[in-house]
Amino acid sequence: MLDKIKKVYINNSGAVTVEEDMSYNAGDKNVSFLQINGIDISILTQAKIKTPGGQIITKTCSNVDLGKNVYKQVLVPCDESGVYQVQIIQSSRDKVSCSNIFQYTVDPGIE
């Protein structure tokens, strides 16, 4: 199964631009990623994700370095269908900044 990567761009003010199609399928475990562009990879970056059931999950983003293409990446949960809300949090020694909240959807799988 191929990885399902959705691209997110964050500017210095925290504004978020996302791909047009921000949906995954239920059950796409371990293959669904957010690729986060536009942020400093030397800063600790976490994704705070609210599931459709209201659970809050915090995941640390990893660095991906493909030469000219450097970005952060995080594996996102796709356990249940519905709308997931995400906020990206960057933490350095003297500053914490948060992105605007954006969302992705998980479509139900074949029953």
Where are these regions (language model features)?
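N-terminal assembly/attachment segments of tailed bacteriophage virion structural proteins
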Residues: M1-E111
